[in-house]
């Protein structure tokens, strides 16, 4: 191989390793067998959630994972691999890919990484069942509001009782 090609591949490894380090979550899938139309729809959905989706050679992915400190992730880079990176939302790539896989038998989740820790296929699928960030925040808000609401109702009940007594 020429030195120019080797340098280009080394640069690609560095770029992918940086994406892996910066990613909140990484999901690796086997997208072999998807039609062009399905792939286009999937990419559009991922882009809409600010998830980067790339098909990258396994040798590049293995070297990048090693460089990013995710050596155990190398075991999923077998056969055709596509990788979804999300820097913001941990749940988005897993949720979108899992929902898409329900309708497209050709798409198979292989594994990934969550906030720098390697995750198995089962862990990625479990992550996909969680509500998105907005859903989790609304749940938290309702839990925080419940005690205040209960106190307000108790005060109102006491006030109503005093009005009735007077």
UniProtKB/Swiss-Prot annotation:
GO terms for molecular function: large ribosomal subunit rRNA binding; structural constituent of ribosome. Gene3D superfamilies: 3.30.70.1730. GO terms for biological process: translation. SUPFAM superfamilies: Ribosomal protein L10-like (SSF160369). InterPro entries: Ribosomal_uL10 (IPR001790), Ribosomal_uL10-like_sf (IPR043141), Ribosomal_uL10_bac (IPR022973), Ribosomal_uL10_bac_type (IPR047865), Ribosomal_uL10_CS_bac (IPR002363). Keywords: Ribonucleoprotein, Ribosomal protein, RNA-binding, rRNA-binding. Forms part of the ribosomal stalk, playing a central role in the interaction of the ribosome with GTP-bound translation factors. HAMAP family: Ribosomal_uL10. This is Large ribosomal subunit protein uL10. It comes from Streptococcus gordonii (strain Challis / ATCC 35105 / BCRC 15272 / CH1 / DL1 / V288). The gene is rplJ.
